[in-house]
Amino acid sequence: MCDDLLEAAEVRNGEWTHRKCKTKLKPVGDNVCYHCGRPVRREKQEYCHDCTRGIQQKQSPYWKGTPFSCYQQGKALFLYQDEAKKMMYRFKYGNRRTYADFFADEAQKQYGDWITGKSVEAVVPVPMYRKKEKQRGYNQADVFAKKLADALGLAYEPAAVQRIVDTKPQKELG
């Protein structure tokens, strides 16, 4: 990616990126884990290795009595590799708040019907620990959640969940 998203006023035909750059973002495809949304190898495979292991171990640090975390199903916009990985890094750590417009627009295009079909009442951002948010300057999940809620006409509830413990970053959870 050239790291040059178009401004909202310049967006043409719903495209926030240059055509050449957009081809660098690889779609996830149809064969994904039913729980987390990661690609799976076989067409009939329902769960990825990690989610299968979670079911087998019947352990959950999040929700007692279930092998899964407290969310029902995850979705991904692009494969988390190459350009998408770099773009996410810039969004999180490079103060590229305008990326939220692009990600929210893509989420609405790819999953808007799925989200509204689930009778979702509100979009709730994943909170950051205050110290981490202060260091980073903002919570990218909060910015994205607001844009997505606006795009889908849903309530936005930033105070619905609070992070009171400074946990390890998701990338360190395995």
Label for each model-derived stretch:
Residues 1-174:
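Glycine-rich phosphate/pyrophosphate-handling loop used in enzymes and phosphotransfer proteins
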